[in-house]
Amino acid sequence: MGVELAFPKVVGKQVYGSLYDCDENVLKDTKRLEQIIKEAADVGNMNILDIKSWKIGEGVSVVAIILESHITIHTWPEYKFATVDVYSCGPHTSPLKAFNYIVEKLGAKKYTINEADRSSEF
């Protein structure tokens, strides 16, 4: 008779999309974008470890490393466009709530949303 091993389930929830007709002043503002990510992490019950940002032309890229994975915002103010990715491996988190918060704060008038279940069972 063999021994059956039970391994924990790995949770992976990803929400990402493209945001159109955003507030171009927010899209240019590195400090404001960093604050939005901090607030979104709170809304999604995530724990920020570090935030890095880079100004690229008029746009900004902000990457937050969270204990559970990451949150990113990349902006193109000249097109009033941004992309957002919220990925979490924490069963206690809500990437969807964090994503929706970012959409609201960037003032997107239109957006796409994609959800991926990246969980795996061993």
From Swiss-Prot:
Q: Where does the signal peptide begin and end?
A: none
Q: How is it modified after translation?
A: Is synthesized initially as an inactive proenzyme. Formation of the active enzyme involves a self-maturation process in which the active site pyruvoyl group is generated from an internal serine residue via an autocatalytic post-translational modification. Two non-identical subunits are generated from the proenzyme in this reaction, and the pyruvate is formed at the N-terminus of the alpha chain, which is derived from the carboxyl end of the proenzyme.
In alphabetical order, the GO MF annotations are: adenosylmethionine decarboxylase activity
Catalytic site positions: S69 (schiff-base intermediate with substrate), H74 (proton acceptor), C89 (proton donor)
Q: Which reaction does it catalyse?
A: S-adenosyl-L-methionine + H(+) = S-adenosyl 3-(methylsulfanyl)propylamine + CO2
The superkingdom of the source organism is Archaea
What cofactors does this protein use? pyruvate
List, in alphabetical order, the GO biological process terms annotated in this UniProt record. spermidine biosynthetic process
- Under Enzyme Commission nomenclature, its number is 4.1.1.50
Q: In which pathway does it act?
A: Amine and polyamine biosynthesis; S-adenosylmethioninamine biosynthesis; S-adenosylmethioninamine from S-adenosyl-L-methionine: step 1/1
| Comment on bound cofactor | Binds 1 pyruvoyl group covalently per subunit.
Which InterPro entries does the UniProt record give? AdoMetDC_fam_prok (IPR003826), S-AdoMet_deCO2ase_core (IPR016067), S-AdoMet_deCOase_pro-enz (IPR017716)
Which residue positions does UniProt flag as site: Cleavage (non-hydrolytic)?
E68, S69
Got a GO cellular component term for this one?
Answer: cytosol
The modified positions for Pyruvic acid (Ser) read S69
Q: Which UniProt keywords apply?
A: Autocatalytic cleavage, Decarboxylase, Lyase, Polyamine biosynthesis, Pyruvate, S-adenosyl-L-methionine, Schiff base, Spermidine biosynthesis, Zymogen
Describe the function of this protein: Catalyzes the decarboxylation of S-adenosylmethionine to S-adenosylmethioninamine (dcAdoMet), the propylamine donor required for the synthesis of the polyamines spermine and spermidine from the diamine putrescine.
State whether it acts alone or in a complex, and with which partners, per the record.
Heterotetramer of two alpha and two beta chains arranged as a dimer of alpha/beta heterodimers.
Instruction: Give the family, as the similarity comment puts it.
Output: Belongs to the prokaryotic AdoMetDC family. Type 1 subfamily.
**The protein's name in its UniProt record:** S-adenosylmethionine decarboxylase proenzyme
The species this protein was found in? Saccharolobus islandicus (strain L.S.2.15 / Lassen #1) (Sulfolobus islandicus)
